[in-house]
Amino acid sequence: MPKVTLYNTAGAAAGEIELNDSVFGVEYNEAVIHQAVVRQMANERLGTHATKTRGLVRGGGRKPWKQKGTGRARVGSIRSPLWVGGGTVFGPTPRSHAKDMTRKARQLAVKSALSEKLRANELIVVDAINFDAPKTKEVVKFLAAFNVDGKALIVDGGTASENTVLSARNIPGVKAYAPSGLNIYDIVHYTKLFLTC
């Protein structure tokens, strides 16, 4: 079982903690992580893109001129794709971009990403984050204690997690939520990951 230093909110070491080997000791699997990230991003797409074909554009039911005898090219509708104001050929239609992935593979991706964060020293375990009130400056002070100036993800399982979420949401590049919201995209996207025990 991997041992990591346990910190307090001031950035000082407060002891050691053993992490579960089945979660934080998993071999790095880039392919599964990539598949999970692509799946999550694809599932967030609305897929409402649409264009009108010649059958959907309003008008064009009447033949503009007779077939023969005018000297002009034959035409059956003013909504032909060749005409200005006509329909679109092979344009996008509404569809689902959803991708599927087995539960075990999704879990493996999260475990693999968390294990890699630990190996890269980008995972910081904090004993508790207790903000009395939602104050942005408290999170700024907390991040400064760990010399974090880039992207940071705070996963707070404590009782005051709502205060943490509200305090962090006004800082660019910083996100905070309860453990139930943890997802593969955020683990990969944010440089530093803070976990409370």
PLM features: what roles do these ranges have?
Residues 1-46, 91-197:
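Extended polybasic, low-complexity segments that bind anionic RNA or targeting/receptor surfaces
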Residues 52-90:
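Glycine/serine-rich anion-binding loops at beta->alpha junctions
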Residues 41-51, 58-59:
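Acidic/His- and Gly-rich active-site-bordering loop/insert found
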